[in-house]
Amino acid sequence: CIKKNKYLIIDETYRDFIYPDKGAPHNLFSIPNWSKNLIQLYSFSKSCCIPGHRLGAITTDKGLISQISKIMDNIQICAPRPAQHSVAKFLPHLENFVNEKSNEIETKANLFSKSLSASSKWEITSIGSFFAYVKHSYNNIKCDDIAKLLAKNCGLITIPGIYFGKKQENFLRMSIAGLSLKEIANVKSRLEKLEKYI
């Protein structure tokens, strides 16, 4: 981006849920004059549990922020001023809450990974703060049909991989953040129950 004089836009809505022991996901802010080619997007809705108010942050060059502000003043999803002022005062007091949530989500992700690690039919190809992308081994069955069978017979709601693009037929996206530890521990047995219906 520096060579081509372009902006790299990174959406770090989930940055507070990156596993603490993994360290920073990148070192882009250590590059001299990073703000000339980097735009970081962030949302308070996930970390601080403040959904619906469209509150977030943009970190970049001051001149560019000035231009972005002009656009935001003229669109409907612009964050309302009272909510902006309220959140600004509370942010310093939310650090412990955010850390607790981060640890809770890490525990859930680790349990989910451990639960599926022994499965021969299912493989976690990527896992993040809220979702896991899981590969199934039923090559002769469409993933949307797999998703229907899981919902109807196993009590698992998933999103077929084809919703995310081509060549995703063998994948399902599963949400794990909203589950209890007990529910996560039961996912493997529910997936295995699918064998009865295939």
Predicted regions, residues:
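Active-site pre-lysine segment of PLP-dependent enzymes
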Residues: 1-8, 14-50
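Residue-level detector of structured alpha->beta connecting loops
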Residues: 5, 120-121, 155
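Short beta-strand segments
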Residues: 9-12, 42, 126, 131-136, ...
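Conserved core segment of the aminotransferase class I/II
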Residues: 34-106, 110-114, 195
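Residue-level recognition of strand-loop junctions within catalytic nucleotide-signaling folds
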Residues: 61-62, 92, 135-137, 177-179
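Conserved glycine-rich beta-strand-loop-beta hairpin in the small C-terminal domain of fold type I
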Residues: 88, 104-113, 123-136, 146, ...
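PLP-dependent enzyme catalytic core of the Aspartate aminotransferase-like
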Residues: 149-158, 164-198
